[in-house]
Amino acid sequence: MSLTANGKANLATSPKTSISSEPIIIRRATLKDAPEMGRVGGRVYYDTPLTSWLWPHRAKYHAQYERHWIERRLALMLNPRNESYVACSSSGQIIGAAQFARLGDDAGAWKRIREIGVLRRVFMWVAAWVFWGYCKVRWWLEGGDKTQNKEAVETFASWCRVDGERYWGSHEERASRWHCQSLVLLPEWQGKGIGKKLMAVVMEKAQRDGVIIGLEASAKGEGLYTKLGFELLGRFTGEAGAVEDVGQGGMMIWYPEGYKKEASSEM
């Protein structure tokens, strides 16, 4: 799959080779990839204003900080609506990762869930609960999380709930969608077209399903998504935007070819 100038899916042509001289492999992630996916995410966001606010003690308790990222990656992978992908160098090193969720109660969403199979869904359900319990017990044994500013985490979670309802929950027409939960790429590999290749995976799926893609863009990531044809629905809540980068970053949406857009983009 390749993308046209306006970011629409062009399924008739193959993607161009990355400008990097080293071949990059995009493949479906496995549960064994979760630790390295988490470490990549933790490294990418380590010095951002938001991370500094949420995890001010991450340097002193780096192992706990890293575990947050690993646990989140694995928890998402144990949801049957999730699809996770990694970008690997020719040596097999994971240099980037993306996680997407197929949301909604439409026929396409349920078809995908059924295709996973009953046994696998049961395994994922049991594994998710076991993993949740394991994480709770481990944090308790360690005396709780020492990396976080708990008040900041609770405040940020409340902002996320407000924005989630404002841009997604209150819009029935946006319920059926692919949602980009995470896209991370090691700094030394950025600017080489790898992020575009990872996003092409979900854009092809959304084009095939005839549904939109939604995501929360960081200040730095907004440029990439704009180039891919995403449109800005609105900035994060004022406080969240200020923490991120002077009001930059926000909720973005992508429409597949032939999709009838909403009559109004009002938030």
Residue ranges: model-predicted function:
Residues 25-39:
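A short beta-loop-alpha structural element at the N-terminal edge
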Residues 56-84, 89, 163-169:
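Active-site rim helix/loop that mediates acceptor-substrate recognition in acyltransferases
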Residues 80-100, 184-186:
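Conserved beta-hairpin
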Residues 99-184, 190, 239-246, 258-265:
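Conserved acyl-donor/pantetheine-binding loop and adjacent beta-alpha core of acyl/acetyltransferases
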Residues 176-178, 206-217:
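Conserved GNAT acetyl-CoA-binding A-motif
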Residues 185, 191-204:
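Conserved acetyl-CoA-binding loop-helix of GNAT-fold acetyltransferases
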Residues 196, 208-210, 219-236:
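Conserved active-site alpha-helix within GNAT-family acetyltransferase domains
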Residues 231-251:
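Conserved catalytic-core motifs of GNAT/GCN5-like acyltransferases
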